[in-house]
Structures are given as C-alpha cells and as structure tokens.
C-alpha cells in the first residue's frame, strides 16, 4: 500500500539516491497506476541500477521527512548516446500549482548534464493537450525543432482525464556542448529547412542533398515498437538503393502488429538523404521536423499515420510551434495529393 504524503511540507530538489527509489515508484504508481508502461520508474531496483550506470540521471523533489513529491530525469532514447531526453517528469498532486517544483527539477537535470562529458544535447517532448510543459520548455531556452503528430494514445492520460484523443508532442532541443555539423538538405524541403533551424544554438553548414542512393551497401534499419502507444520508430542506420523495398516491407510488418503511428528517422549527415525523403513521401510519409545530433549527425523526422489528425485539438501555445505546425500540415496535405489511394495515411 502506498503511504499518504502530508501536504505543505518544505522541499528541495536533489540528485537521486538509492533510498529515494521506493518513493519515486510510489509516486508513479499513485499517479499513473500499475499499468504504467516504463517499468524503470515503478520498479525500485531497476531505477537504482539505471541511475548507477548513468543511463538515467534522476532529479527528485524531496521533503525533510524524505517523502518524494516530484521526479524528472535525463535518459538516452536517441541513436546517439550523447543525446539525452528530459522526461519521466511528474509532481505529487498536493505539490502542484505555482510551487515551481517541475521547473527546478528540469533545471537541476540540465545542470547535471552540463557537468557530464557524455551529455551534449538534451531534448524534451512537451505535450500539446495543455500549455504547461510548452511554457516550461521555452523558459529553459529549449527551441522547438519538430512535432510528433498523434504520438500518445488518450489512455495514457486517462487517470488525469486531460485528453480525448491521441496527443501530439513537440520535440524541443537545447545544446549543452557545441559540436558543429554539416546538414544535407533534401530538395523537397529546401525552402523550409531554414525555418526549422532558426535560432540554432550551434554551428551548422547546409548543403543540398544531391547524391543518389547507391547499391554498394545494404539498407539497415533499427526499429522500436511501443505496443502500449501503437507507435513504431524506425532509425535508418544505413541507406542503399534497396531502401524503398526494405522500408515498405518493414512498414507492412508494423501495420500487421497494430501500429498506428510510424516514425522514420533519417540522418541528414548522409548525402543520399534527399532521395530517401522522396521515396518516403511517395509512400505517404510527411515531414515532421529536424533532430539535432540525433545520429551524432543531425536527423530528419518523417511520419505516417493510420488515423487522420484532429488538427484543431492540437494546442500550441507559442508562435514558433504554430508556424512549424502549419508547414508540417501543408506537407501532410501535399503527400495526400501524391497518394490519393490512402489519403496519406498508413494502412487505409
């Protein structure tokens, strides 16, 4: 049984220690229930091991009694091991609303990231069913670079009843350690790439992607499927002339598993990326944005959906995300025109 926490206590934000693990698990279980899909945060021994190994860097809000009233973490979820996500954040219901806990935990995580040699870029996924995390991200100097349409099912937010349909998220980035890169720009997106890279906090050199796909190597994919969300993320590790065939076979496999959102990550460090983008667009994928340092080189997000987005229910608080969304929606509509049979949607 989860012990109640006395409201109104003083608290501080600190680095996670093993004795905090049960309190973090209780917090997640109390808010999200026992079906929470990421087991690291509801199984104390796993959380201790992940923090010990450095794969997770947890920050906790703790009272003088030792009660855990908040948690946020940095963790690696991109192909590049030097890019960490800021997430797994939550605050006890009695400690929400103007206390600043979430902001302090996220700030604490960035401070710890700057102290470590293995954390060079951090990103977050502010949800678009309410403005809080969008405001937090902006206040911490993150910049929106991509938007994940229909990422999370409404069931994820059922306990707090904050969504009626699938929830879209932003992808916001901040550079902690400079690492200049060359970006190969697909011809299809030559006019809009500069907008997605506006206010970039690191150096980028842009060249047009003009090299054709080659048969000298084979296409290599690394796919993650998130069954609870019905989402698949396909990291393209190597591009070859067989990419259209390999990708179509992978998509067919994923749709048979019940996947409703397919994301494809391409490296814009590859001079052939433009032809891969053209292939994906001809198969119903639309542009989602850019991903700094995603493969160590930058990445490009392409998306395909089974369900048509309810665009009007995507709540965007800032002008920048509204501008990017308009460009993304325009490409979604253009791709529908290229694929009249399925209207730009996977599996329909």
What is each PLM-predicted segment?
Residues 1-19:
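Conserved N-terminal entry element of GNAT/NAT acetyltransferase domains
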Residues 15-93, 126-127, 222-230, 237-242, ...:
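A conserved beta-strand-loop-helix scaffold within acyl/acetyltransferase catalytic domains
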Residues 56-60, 71, 169, 277, ...:
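Short hydrophobic/aromatic beta-strand element in the GNAT-like acyltransferase core
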Residues 91, 97-113, 122-124, 243-251:
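Conserved acetyl-CoA-binding loop-helix of GNAT-fold acetyltransferases
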Residues 112-127, 257-267:
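Conserved GNAT acetyl-CoA-binding A-motif
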Residues 123-125, 141-161, 286-297:
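Conserved catalytic-core motifs of GNAT/GCN5-like acyltransferases
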Residues 128-146, 156, 271-287:
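Conserved active-site alpha-helix within GNAT-family acetyltransferase domains
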Residues 197-289, 293:
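Non-catalytic interaction/regulatory modules that flank or connect domains
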């Amino acid at each position: 049984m989860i012990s109640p926490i006395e409201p109104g206590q003083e608290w501080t934000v600190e680095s996670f220690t093993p004795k905090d693990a049960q309190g973090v698990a209780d917090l997640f279980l109390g808010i999200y229930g026992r079906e929470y899909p990421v087991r690291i945060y509801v199984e104390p021994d796993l959380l201790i091991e992940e923090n010990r190994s450095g794969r997770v860097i947890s920050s906790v809000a703790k009272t003088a009694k030792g009660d855990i009233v908040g948690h946020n973490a940095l963790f690696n979820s991109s192909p590049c091991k030097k890019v960490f996500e800021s997430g797994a954040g939550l605050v006890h219901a009695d400690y929400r609303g103007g206390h600043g806990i979430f902001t302090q935990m996220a700030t604490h995580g960035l401070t710890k990231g700057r102290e470590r040699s293995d954390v060079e870029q951090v990103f977050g996924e502010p949800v678009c069913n309410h403005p809080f995390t969008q405001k937090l991200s902006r206040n911490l100097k993150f910049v929106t670079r991509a938007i994940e349409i229909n990422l999370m099912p409404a069931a994820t937010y059922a306990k707090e009843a904050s969504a009626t349909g699938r929830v879209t998220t932003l992808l916001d980035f901040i550079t902690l350690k400079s690492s200049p890169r060359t970006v190969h720009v697909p011809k299809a997106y030559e006019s809009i790439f500069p907008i997605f890279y506006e206010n970039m906090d690191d150096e980028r050199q842009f060249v047009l992607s003009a090299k054709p796909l080659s048969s000298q190597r084979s296409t290599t994919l690394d796919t993650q499927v998130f069954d609870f969300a019905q989402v698949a993320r396909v990291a393209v590790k190597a591009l070859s002339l067989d990419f259209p065939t390999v990708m179509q076979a992978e998509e067919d496999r994923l749709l048979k598993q019940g996947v409703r959102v397919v994301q494809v990550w391409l490296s814009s460090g590859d001079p052939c990326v433009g032809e891969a983008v053209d292939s994906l667009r001809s198969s119903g994928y639309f542009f989602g944005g850019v991903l700094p340092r995603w493969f160590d080189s930058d990445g490009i997000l392409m998306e395909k959906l089974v369900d048509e987005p309810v665009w009007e229910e995507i709540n965007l608080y800032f002008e920048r995300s509204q501008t990017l969304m308009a460009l993304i929606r325009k490409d979604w509509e253009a791709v529908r025109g290229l694929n009249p049979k399925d209207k730009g949607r996977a599996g329909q």
